[in-house]
């Protein structure tokens, strides 16, 4: 029944997974015979009905556990038996038995073909095995016959042949041993010729051959000798490798690398090479410094050789410091150049080997070579930083071994130049920013520069106090680029000047120092200073250069050596400095020079010797900043102090006048006042002597300040004949404006080196200080304008005029002629001054503007002093003023006349009604309380009554109250 159940399960029957047991209890459940199978299959059937019958069989009949079926069925009987129900149940069991029997019969018949086929396969396998046994038996029999007939007869022949082969091999071995005994002579010759690869190749081959014959007693001694020779070769190879560090030779290094590759020690060679480079750096710097120390000591004392490098550096004298530093950098350059060329060699050979490997070779060998190549590459790249770090530390030790504060400025600049060049080498060598060198030289530079700047400020104060403000005669085409201190700007234009031109300028890769000096030379060779060979052609024979001299210079085309090269071309881009390709003909240039003669003469720069010294000082500061960019902010800060102090001195000498601010004319802008206050607080030491009770912090702050300068006693500013020192005022003020223009010109260069975080300081300096230079013109020239014309005399003349006339006058008053005469005299004296010093048009305009404005305000003040005035008197005022304007316009080209409306509006206000005048008073606050009050009082009785007068005076008082 278990098999029946399993067959039913494989057929996908849903009957419970249990088997029928103990079928003997029911005869009706016996397995049908073949006849019954046939009958069952012949009976018509409904598969679905049969499946339902099978599914209706109780679970217990499929159970694998044995149980009593009869007992089970009897226990199921009800207490009261019903025959009909029993028969129905019995029929049901019979139907279930028939369905199961039929299903079993179907399954058996279905599997019968497979059973027959498998039985046939087993029978065929049995037949094949029997045939194989027969073949094996026959084979064994034939093998025994062959063994007895052939093997024993051939053994003698084989033994003789073997003996022959052994003897031949012995003969070859003896010959090889003989050759090996003679190789030591050849090895010595190859070592003397420095043919290391050949020697190693021969030695390795001998060792390989010797290992083959190690069973011979005579070989052991030879093998030991070859091993000693190989070790000797390695020692000589290491010495040869060390020579690479100072003088790289391609052929020599190629032999050494081939030798190490034959030894299989490529990685070891690279480790040794870096040790040699480190040792070479130490030995090189020590020997260079030791040589200078012993030379300066003047004796052969050996105590210096026992000193540490750090202690040895402290014995270098100031005189030999720069040559020693240059030689030190030159020697270190040779070491770094050798390393650079070593890397070049490996890059070249790696590419060649890669190309050869791509053509096909041993895969294992290629992988090993690639591994070695990768190791060497990483080692070399890592070594760049290590070697540069060693170089930095050695140079840093040397730099800190001597106090640089005692050096002259040019010597210190030279030291910075060498260190800057060394940092450039470091950047090209390994991309390093040389933080160690930068920090060491930055601290020394700032300390040096602070002391240097303090001395320069004191010198500037001395120059200013001794300056007589005479014109320094420079040529009309003067440019600061013609000064030696600014030559470096022409050699290396700032990249920020022309950002749009950068791609084209850098389209070709710049040549590095290693590429430039790879074949020879040294970037640290001390070059002679060529400044003395060049002469600055900036000074003229006098302030203007005589007309004959200049005209002849312009007429003679060949005598244009003083004209900058840029001016000879078509045009120069002011932003980029680039010159177009288009050329200019000789005729065009000649005509242009003639036409520009007067223009150049008019535009000749106005500056003093002190101005020129400040400009030169700025150039020197920029040289230091250009060489050592990390201190750019400090240098620019000190440069700004030079300008601040110059500006403050000009203001103190010529523009300080408390009465100016009381005029309320806004002569000094709030920006200018803020700038002057800032300079006074941060830079000017207002205390005459040091206060012993001052704190240490205050003393340090005062140390950074400079006393306020005093005007030279030779400069007379009180003489009316010279227009109260107008010539000196013009030279001083316009020299400041010129200095500001030069700072504007230098702004792109300063901006290019200024750190990004500090650029707001530079922008603030230019917007709040440099740009205010021209604003000093107003207060300085106002003092001249206030004294050049006798305004008090005009007021006295106006008080003598009778303004309450009853008829309209046709003749103007005398004070107008007196005032015009004063202006004519002023114009005459102005022309006299212009013969000494060129007065620029903006200065002339400011002077005339100040004088006219003061005159007009004096006229209004005179009208405000009038006690009584009629309508005809007001008409006379208008007549006087119109006459004054008409004559004044012939003396000056200023249009419109300053404060013209200020007078006219005041005169016309006399005719206003009460309401209009009240509104007019509130709208015109530019008039003083006295002037407004007088206007109301004069109008009393004519068209304003007392009540209206009180109202208007109250309005004036309301306006004046906030001013108190």
Curated annotation (Swiss-Prot):
Coiled coil: 81-107, 216-244
Family that this chain belongs to: Belongs to the syndetin family.
GO molecular function, one term: SNARE binding
Tissue: Expressed in the brain (at protein level).
Chain residue numbers at which the record places covalent cross-link Glycyl lysine isopeptide (Lys-Gly) (interchain with G-Cter in SUMO1): 963
Entry superkingdom: Eukaryota
One Pfam family matching this protein: Syndetin_C
Upper classification of the organism: Eukaryota, Metazoa, Chordata, Craniata, Vertebrata
Name assigned to this protein: Syndetin
Modified residues (Phosphoserine): 15, 494, 498, 559, 561
Glycyl lysine isopeptide (Lys-Gly) (interchain with G-Cter in SUMO2) crosslink residues: 963
Summary of the function given for this chain in its UniProt record: Acts as a component of the EARP complex that is involved in endocytic recycling. The EARP complex associates with Rab4-positive endosomes and promotes recycling of internalized transferrin receptor (TFRC) to the plasma membrane. Within the EARP complex, required to tether the complex to recycling endosomes. Not involved in retrograde transport from early and late endosomes to the trans-Golgi network (TGN).
Region (Disordered): 1-25, 532-563
GO cellular component term of the entry, any: recycling endosome
GO biological process: endocytic recycling; protein transport
Subcellular location as annotated: Recycling endosome; Membrane
Summary of subunit composition and partner proteins: Component of the endosome-associated retrograde protein (EARP) complex, composed of VPS51, VPS52, VPS53 and VPS50/Syndetin. The EARP complex interacts with EIPR1. Interacts with VPS51 and VPS53 in an EIPR1-independent manner.
Signal peptide start-end: none
Keywords: Acetylation, Coiled coil, Endosome, Isopeptide bond, Membrane, Phosphoprotein, Protein transport, Transport, Ubl conjugation
Modified residues (N-acetylmethionine): 1
């Amino acid at each position: 029944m278990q098999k029946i159940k399993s067959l039913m399960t494989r057929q996908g029957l849903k009957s419970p997974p249990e088997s029928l047991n103990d079928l003997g209890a029911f005869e009706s459940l016996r397995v049908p015979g073949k006849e019954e199978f046939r009958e069952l299959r012949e009976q018509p059937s409904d598969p679905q009905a049969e499946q339902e019958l099978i599914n209706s069989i109780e679970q217990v009949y499929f159970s694998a556990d044995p149980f009593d079926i009869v007992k089970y069925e009897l226990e199921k009987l009800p207490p009261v038996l019903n025959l009909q129900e029993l028969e129905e149940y019995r029929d049901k069991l019979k139907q279930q038995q028939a369905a199961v029997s039929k299903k079993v019969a179907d399954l058996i018949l279905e599997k019968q073909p497979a059973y027959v086929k498998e039985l046939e396969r087993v029978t065929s396998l049995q037949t094949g095995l029997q045939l194989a046994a027969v073949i094996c038996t026959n084979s064994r029999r034939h093998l025994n016959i062959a063994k007895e007939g052939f093997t024993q007869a051939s053994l003698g022949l084989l033994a003789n042949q073997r003996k022959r082969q052994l003897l031949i091999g012995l003969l070859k071995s003896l010959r090889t041993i003989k050759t090996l005994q003679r190789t030591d002579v050849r090895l010595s010759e190859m070592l003397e010729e420095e043919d290391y690869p050949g020697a190693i190749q021969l030695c390795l081959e001998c060792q390989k051959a010797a290992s083959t014959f190690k069973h011979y007693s005579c070989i052991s001694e030879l093998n030991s000798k070859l091993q000693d020779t190989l070790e000797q070769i390695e020692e000589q190879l290491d010495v040869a490798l060390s020579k690479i560090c100072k003088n790289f030779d391609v052929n020599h290094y190629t032999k050494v690398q081939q030798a190490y590759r034959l030894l299989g020690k490529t990685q070891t060679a690279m480790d040794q090479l870096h040790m040699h480079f480190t040792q070479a750096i130490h030995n090189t710097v020590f020997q260079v410094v030791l040589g200078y120390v012993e030379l300066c000591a003047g004796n052969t004392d050996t105590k210096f050789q026992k000193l540490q490098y750090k202690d040895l550096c402290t014995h270098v004298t100031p005189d030999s410091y720069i040559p020693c530093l240059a030689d030190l950098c030159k020697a270190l350059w040779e070491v770094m150049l050798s390393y650079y060329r070593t890397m070049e060699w490996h890059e070249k050979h790696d590419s060649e080997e890669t190309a050869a490997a791509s053509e096909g070779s041993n895969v294992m060998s290629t992988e090993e070579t690639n591994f070695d190549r990768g190791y060497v590459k990483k080692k070399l790249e890592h070594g760049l930083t290590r070697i540069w770090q060693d170089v930095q530390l050695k140079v840093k030790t040397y730099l800190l071994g001597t106090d640089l504060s005692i050096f002259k400025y040019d010597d210190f600049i030279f030291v910075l130049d060498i260190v800057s060049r060394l940092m450039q080498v470091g950047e090209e060598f390994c991309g390093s920013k040389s933080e160690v060198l930068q920090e060491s030289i930055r601290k020394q530079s700032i300390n040096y520069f602070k002391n240097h700047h303090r001395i320069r400020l004191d010198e500037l104060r001395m120059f200013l106090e001794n300056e007589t403000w005479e014109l320094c005669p420079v040529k009309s085409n003067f440019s600061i680029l013609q000064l030696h201190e600014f030559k470096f700007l022409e050699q290396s234009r700032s990249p920020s000047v022309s950002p749009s031109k950068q791609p084209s300028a850098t389209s070709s890769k710049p040549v590095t120092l290693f590429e430039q000096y790879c074949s020879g030379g040294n970037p640290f060779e001390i070059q002679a200073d060529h400044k003395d060979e060049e002469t600055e052609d900036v000074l003229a024979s006098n302030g203007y250069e005589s007309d004959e001299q200049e005209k002849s210079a312009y007429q003679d085309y060949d005598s244009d050596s003083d004209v900058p090269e840029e001016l000879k071309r078509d045009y120069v881009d002011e932003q980029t400095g680039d010159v177009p390709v288009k050329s200019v003909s000789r005729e065009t240039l000649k005509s242009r020079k003639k036409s520009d003669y007067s223009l150049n003469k008019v535009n000749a720069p106005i500056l003093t010797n002190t101005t020129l010294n400040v400009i030169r000082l700025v150039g020197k500061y920029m040289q230091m900043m250009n060489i050592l960019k990390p201190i750019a902010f400090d240098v620019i800060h000190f440069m700004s102090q030079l300008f601040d102090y110059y500006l403050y001195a000009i203001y103190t000498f010529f523009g300080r006048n408390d009465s100016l601010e009381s005029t309320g004319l806004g002569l000094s802008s709030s920006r200018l006042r803020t700038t002057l206050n800032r300079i006074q607080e941060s830079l000017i030491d207002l205390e005459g002597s040091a206060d012993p009770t001052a704190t240490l912090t205050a003393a340090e702050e005062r140390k950074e300040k400079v006393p306020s300068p005093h005007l030279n006693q030779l400069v007379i500013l009180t003489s009316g004949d010279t227009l109260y020192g107008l010539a000196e005022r013009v030279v001083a003020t316009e020299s400041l404006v010129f200095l500001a223009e030069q700072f504007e010109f230098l702004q792109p260069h300063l901006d290019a080196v200024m750190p990004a975080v500090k650029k707001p300081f530079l922008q603030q300096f230019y917007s709040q200080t440099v740009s205010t230079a021209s604003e000093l013109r107003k207060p300085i020239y106002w003092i001249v304008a206030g004294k050049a014309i006798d305004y008090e005399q005009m007021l006295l003349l106006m008080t003598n005029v009778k303004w309450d006339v009853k008829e309209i006058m046709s003749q103007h008053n005398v004070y107008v002629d007196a005032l015009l005469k004063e202006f004519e005299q002023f114009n005459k004296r102005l022309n006299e001054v212009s013969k000494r010093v060129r007065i620029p048009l903006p200065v002339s305009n400011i002077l005339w503007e100040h004088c006219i404005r003061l005159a007009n305000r004096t006229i209004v003040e005179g009208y405000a002093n009038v006690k009584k005035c009629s309508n005809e008197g007001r008409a006379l005022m208008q007549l006087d003023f119109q006459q004054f304007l008409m004559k004044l316009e012939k003396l000056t080209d200023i249009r419109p006349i300053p404060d013209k409306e200020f007078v006219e509006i005041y005169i016309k206000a006399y005719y206003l009604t009460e309401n209009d005048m009240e509104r007019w008073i509130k709208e015109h606050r530019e008039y003083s309380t006295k002037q407004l009050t007088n206007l109301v009082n004069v109008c009393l009785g004519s068209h304003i009554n007392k009540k209206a007068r009180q109202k208007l005076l109250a309005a004036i008082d309301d306006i004046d109250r906030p001013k108190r």
